[in-house]
Amino acid sequence: MSILSFGSGTITDDDTSGANGEGTGITLANVPGVSRTHRPDTPPVALSIAGSDSGGGAGAQADLKTFAAHRVHGATALTAITAQSTAAVRGVVVLEPDFVRLQIETVLGDLSVRSVKTGMLATRAIVDVVADLAAAGRLPQLVVDPVLVSSSGHPLMDPDGIEAYLTRLIPHALVVTPNLREAAALTDSPLEDLLSVPAMSAAAERIRSHGATYVVVKGGHLTDVAHDVVAGPEGTTVLEAARIDTRNDHGTGCSLSAAIAANLALGADGLTAIRRAKAFVARGLAGGASWTLGAGHGPIDHFGWSASP
């Protein structure tokens, strides 16, 4: 087991290794988590299949901000539209599965998509649409953020939909990024049984046994350190970051999975993409910690604005 730590202050990432251990020549400058050595003539493309957050903190909006922060062109296929603020979700309209498919196929038919991430899929029927496309090899470097349970613990997917994730979608994923509640749902375990790094590691391996290459179980704030446990071909890796005391944590899961997809689109290998994404979110949390956007949980600082002169 290896452990990597990220502080809450300045985070650097000088490792620009690609999938073959060679430098990609692509890093980011003045953006949380990574830096850029040169600009490609044409930016790579990442696709987000997710719901819309009208408050701009999570969902497809957080994904697009994350892609832009990495200078990756972001495309979207919306699964649902929410009436949402920093304080509450007042309504949700789920789009028809056939229209979700049409959005995805329209993007894939025009843009050279290098990576794809999923967020809120809302229904079993939409999970099946995405799984069918993944099985056909049309969703490259797929990152699955299994949005199954709300932050308050309310189920967002029925048991049939969870089964579809396990048997139809996760087998085609390069990376899966459940939080503790979602890991509990995917492993049919009580949440209280997952509140340790060894238990998180075991849950990650159970989910990975369904066919994913990497599984990142996000521990949040188990103690004064935020632990994420990664199960992958290299074994188990524990990513640590100092706890940041802020209410501005809306969309952290969306931003993490989008940052993984962005780094994959830029040429990083799986574990490097995960590590860079963890650093990106840690910097975003630190940067936006004192913001006062809205009455509830605000977004993170995707663009390093707080660090800018």
Indicate where each model-derived feature is located.
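Short, small-residue alpha-helix embedded
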Residues: 66, 184-185, 247-270
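Conserved N-terminal subdomain of the carbohydrate kinase-like
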Residues: 36-48, 60, 64-156, 303-306
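Nucleotide and nucleotide-moiety/phosphate-recognizing core
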Residues: 125-140, 213, 227-236, 270-272
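Conserved phosphate/ATP/ADP-binding segment of small-molecule kinases
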Residues: 159-236
